[in-house]
C-alpha cells in the first residue's frame, strides 16, 4: 500500500508559517492600547459600599449595580418613586420623573450624567494609535479643548460658543488649579468655576484612534448654580485641537 507522505521540507515550511502567524498575532495584540478606566475616586464616592475597580468586563454592570441608598423622585402627577441604580434612574427620567425637591435637581442631573458616562465608557475598545498619550490637564488644555465645553447659561451664550473654535475663546480661563493627574479646576472671567475629570481613555468610534472621556461640573463662585456634562473627545495629531465625538 502506498502512503501519500508530505515531504519533510514542506511540513517544516507549514510549521514555520503557522508559528510566524501566531507570533505576528501576539505582537499585534501586544501593540494594541487597552482602554484605561480612571474614575475610581468618583466611583468610591458614588457607591455606599466597596465595589470592583472599573474594567471592560464590569463597566456595563454598573447600570444595574445597587448604590446602597435610594433617591426620591416625583413627577407632575405627584406620583413618587424611589430608585437605587442607574438603570432605574434612566427609566424614571424617560417617563417624566425628576428630583422630588427643587433643591435636589442639580444632584439629580449629576447622577444622570454619571450614569451616562459609565454607559459611554463601556463602549471603549482597544486602540491602535494615540495622540493623547502625553495629554495632561493643565493651563494649556482650554486652548486645545473645543468650544462645546463652554459654560453655557443662556441661548445667547450657546449660540456664541458655536462660532468659536476653543473653550478658552468662549470662557477666557483666568486660572487653573491641577488637583491630580485626572482632575483640574478652571476659573473663568465671569465668576465661573469648572471642574474637569478624565474618566477613561480608549477607542470610542472604532477608528483605531484613542479617545478620551471627560466629565465637566459647572458652578458659580458667588451663586448656587450647578450643572454636569459628559464628553468624548478625540484629535488626529499631537498638537491638533480636540473635537467632540459624543456629548451628554
Where are the regions a protein language model picked out?
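Acidic/hydrophobic-patterned starts of short beta strands in beta-sheet-rich repeat architectures
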Residues: 206-217
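Beta-propeller-forming repeat regions
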Residues: 30-202, 216-248
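Bacterial N-terminal signal peptides that target proteins for export
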Residues: 2-15
Amino acid at each position: 500500500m502506498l502512503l501519500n507522505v508530505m515531504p519533510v521540507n514542506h511540513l517544516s515550511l507549514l510549521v514555520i508559517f503557522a508559528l510566524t502567524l501566531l507570533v505576528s498575532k501576539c505582537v499585534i495584540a501586544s501593540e494594541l492600547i487597552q482602554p484605561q478606566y480612571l474614575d475610581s475616586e468618583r466611583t468610591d464616592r458614588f457607591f455606599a459600599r466597596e465595589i470592583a475597580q472599573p474594567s471592560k468586563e464590569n463597566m456595563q454592570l454598573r447600570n444595574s449595580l445597587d448604590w446602597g441608598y435610594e433617591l426620591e423622585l416625583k413627577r407632575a402627577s405627584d406620583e413618587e418613586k424611589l430608585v437605587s441604580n442607574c438603570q432605574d434612574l434612566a427609566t424614571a427620567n424617560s417617563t417624566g420623573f425628576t428630583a422630588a425637591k427643587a433643591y435636589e435637581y442639580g444632584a439629580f442631573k449629576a447622577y444622570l450624567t454619571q450614569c451616562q458616562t459609565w454607559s459611554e465608557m463601556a463602549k471603549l475598545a482597544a486602540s491602535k494609535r494615540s495622540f493623547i498619550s502625553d495629554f495632561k490637564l493643565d493651563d494649556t488644555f482650554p486652548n486645545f479643548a473645543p468650544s462645546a465645553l463652554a459654560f453655557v447659561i443662556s441661548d445667547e451664550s450657546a449660540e456664541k460658543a458655536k462660532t468659536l473654535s476653543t473653550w478658552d475663546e468662549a470662557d477666557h480661563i483666568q486660572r487653573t488649579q491641577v488637583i491630580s493627574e485626572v482632575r483640574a479646576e478652571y476659573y473663568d472671567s465671569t465668576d465661573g468655576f469648572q471642574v474637569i475629570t478624565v474618566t477613561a481613555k480608549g477607542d470610542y468610534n472604532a477608528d483605531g484612534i484613542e479617545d478620551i472621556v471627560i466629565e465637566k461640573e459647572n458652578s458659580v463662585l458667588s451663586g448656587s448654580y450647578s450643572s454636569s456634562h459628559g464628553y468624548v473627545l478625540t484629535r488626529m495629531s499631537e498638537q491638533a485641537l480636540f473635537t467632540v465625538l459624543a456629548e451628554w
